[in-house]
């Protein structure tokens, strides 16, 4: 079979065409067993070269019967559609019903969808969100892999609202460092499994793995699931034992003033860590805040240099940078501390400066030792809290 992408790199980016890896296609296809009634019609609305649809057919008790009677494929690009049909003929000796239509414009009479929608933007819109919204409106259940950006931001409110109409909703989130799902695209992606069987809401945090451990990561996917906190405003990405830190109580912003003697400077370009300094850093990207008094300054210094802020950013935001909105929304925690730990942090921010060149200029940051971060975590986070700095 031919699963070679016919597009060059520029065409891939322009058209948002990234084919589903075979191992991820299997992950998605197996989740269909959760809600497939054995009778309904499945559609792959943007089948590409057929990896997803062929995998879905392959796991059936009678793949040929499934292809002939329960599968529909669609591909707007006729060149890719012809390759897919050839792949089906080679694999099963038969081809499914097929269309060369615009999925968003054409009415398909189907029950379920499995898809990897295009990732490109048109004007200010993410096309993949329209695919999700149509799937929500026309199916009893669907499985999709798409960018993680739908989890927050006002422009995706409608998408999240439609997803919430499904009583069962499970979402797996994948980071793009150090390993990545698509070898030819460095994008954070999510697998959404939405259906009407049972009532369950589950999610993962943004899963990270080293490329050499990809197989074990996939095999242990469900161990990362926790009870989900999904709202129209945000779909939180939570690991087990962290949901309790999401609450509607006091936020960091409740302890800030317009100006004071207690400033903090927070780097806004996180990769593996976020730090807050009592002094301005020699870097382009940082957020300046003023705490209202000495006690709130010290607690903020501890919280913002622990794993907590980094976890919050990964949990509620899908941006590549830390926004002031996300920073100020950090749930506030009151706890006891000793002034000695404050002195340790202030000393560490002087001794553990690191520099990375960006846009021709060295950007200063602070990388506290793991032991210090662990000590800060222990002051107000439970023992099982995810070790995000490992």
What residue ranges belong to the model's regions?
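Signature of N6-adenine DNA methyltransferases within the class I
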Residues: 13-14, 18-29, 46-57, 65-83, ...
